[in-house]
Amino acid sequence: GKMDIKEEHYEKEFIDINKMLEQITDRFALTHPEKNFIKHIPKSPIFVEGDQDKLTQVFDNIVNNAIKYSPNGKNITIRVRQNYHHNRVSISIKDEGVGIPLVHIDKIFNRFYRVDKSRQRSMGGTGLGLALAKNIIEAHKGRIWAQSREGYGSIIFVTLPCEQIDDEWL
């Protein structure tokens, strides 16, 4: 299959990223009651300009991976922070799962890359997931990267440009 990101059509609309992440987390919390979701998501809206469906797909994929790699009862923490100038938002999704070996950490965003084939089979493939996520985030002028400690879990970080819309405009 040919997938050239340049041919993709991106919608442009203002999306409340906090509301989106609340909804995604709440949906997974319903379908995976055995997982422990912790949300640090501000109540006031933070707006990102972009494609709602594609960004939802990205965060769905990241949270779904966190669920797959986290033992039951461990925490999955979704955190949203704005930088000092309120022009970038940083989202982190942290699991307390098996972690990713350091030698693999930068390769997980490559197409069809798999950390461990034997483990992957039981987990279901995430080959295209993070590569596609990277394409989508970069098309939104953002960045995505990972940190991990084997045996302690992983954190996926996403930063995106955002707009702080004053309350009086809402």
Each language-model region and where it sits:
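Conserved micro-motifs of the catalytic ATP-binding
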Residues: 5-10, 47-50
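A conserved beta-strand-to-alpha-helix junction within the catalytic ATP-binding
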Residues: 11-26
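Conserved catalytic submotifs in the C-terminal HATPase_c
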Residues: 11-14, 36-46, 83
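Short helix-loop "hinge" at the ATP-lid/N-box region of the Bergerat-fold HATPase_c
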Residues: 66-67
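Short beta-strand/loop element within the Bergerat-fold HATPase_c
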Residues: 73-87
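Short conserved segment of the HATPase_c
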Residues: 100-112
